[in-house]
A protein has these predicted regions:
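Conserved anion-binding
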Residues: 1-91
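Active-site-proximal glycine-rich helix-loop-beta segment
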Residues: 2, 110, 117
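Conserved strand-to-helix beginnings and helix N-cap segments that scaffold or border functional pockets
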Residues: 17, 68, 104, 126-130
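Catalytic cores of alpha/beta
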Residues: 38-50, 96-114
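Conserved, mostly hydrophobic/aromatic
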Residues: 53, 78, 95, 106, ...
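Short Gly/Pro-enriched loop/turn and capping motifs at secondary-structure junctions
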Residues: 60-61, 97-101, 120-121
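C-terminal helical cap(s) of enzyme catalytic domains, especially alpha/beta-barrels
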Residues: 107, 121-141
Length: 141
């Protein structure tokens, strides 16, 4: 059994590197999620252990929140940080209030994985679901 991506929350353990190392035998991509208030520099010591960063754009735990405004700037700073560290290979994933507009902005900052949900693709009429996904994809291309 193999997962494609497994994400560890930076704030969930004092042993981030150990948690990431634990995943090596499973052959999955290792992502590190960081909360809106976590400084980008905190992840520097584990860059060699990750394939991607999941930047949370809202505080975790509740669907339907509005984006934390500073996270848009943080996404841009993260892109620059990864360039400075010569780690442009690290994938940027964004999660939380990812509207079409936010998605387009975040794409310009290097995001390539978008966790879409309540703010962009969920709808009460499932017959519109495919249309919502197409609209979102077009917005972030």
């Amino acid at each position: 059994y193999k997962e494609d991506i497994v994400t560890i929350h930076y704030e969930s353990t004092f042993q981030v590197q150990r948690a990431l190392d634990y995943l090596v035998p499973y052959g999955c991509k290792r992502f590190l999620a960081i909360n809106p208030a976590t400084p980008i520099g905190q992840i520097e010591e584990v860059l060699d252990y990750i394939d991607g960063v999941n930047l949370l754009m809202v505080n975790p735990g509740f669907a339907g929140q509005k984006i934390v405004p500073s996270t848009l700037r943080k996404a841009e700073k993260l892109q620059k940080f990864l360039q400075e560290m010569h780690r442009e290979d690290i994938i940027l994933e964004v999660d939380g209030n990812i509207t079409k507009e936010h998605g387009a902005t975040l794409r310009s900052f290097g995001a390539s994985i978008f966790v879409a949900g309540t703010s962009s693709i969920f709808c009460t009429d499932v017959s519109h679901f495919g249309e919502k996904i197409r609209e979102f994809r077009k917005a972030v291309e």
